[in-house]
Amino acid sequence: MTQVSVVTPASAEVIQLGPTRMRILEDGRTTGHRLGIGEITLPPRTPGPPQHRHARHDEGFYVVSGAARFTVGETTYDAAPGTLVMIPPGAPHTFANLGDEPTVLLNTFTPDLYVQYFRDLGQLIACGEPLTPENTIEAMSRYATTPATDYA
């Protein structure tokens, strides 16, 4: 029988990355690694990562609640609940919560490659290492992702 995945609010894997929380909803095991899904919660006034590019996966963001600002190269998009932002491979991007309310984003990865990146960052923190630009870039590099230094 085909396996079905049901992830409840209490059963999701949770990775705390400083003030940002990532809940892993699908890590690729059920989808043959074609799709990964996470839920990102950004507290008010929380920046995201520096602009970066993924070489081997698409990334999607669906705004569930709150508001987010997406920066893609030099262009910004203010996204209200119900907005979907799809980032193709190679596009420089970042996101942030500039508002006074928490922002919840449904985050997709096709294929699921980037789920392990968040686990790697969580492991660094669990081992007592602070996240630095150097160790974050090193972790990114394992998943075909590079900083978009031309938009730093």
Predicted regions and their residues:
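Acidic/histidine-enriched, glycine/proline-rich intrinsically disordered or flexible terminal extensions
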Residues: 119-152
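Structural motif
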Residues: 21, 60, 67-69, 76, ...
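Hydrophobic ligand-binding cavity/cleft-lining segments
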Residues: 1-15
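Short acidic-glycine-tyrosine-enriched beta hairpin
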Residues: 8, 74-92
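A short glycine-rich, His/Asp/Glu-containing loop-to-beta-strand
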Residues: 13-51, 57-58
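Ligand-binding loop in jelly-roll beta-barrel domains
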Residues: 69, 89-115
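Short, conserved beta-strand element in jelly-roll/cupin
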Residues: 39-43, 53-72, 108
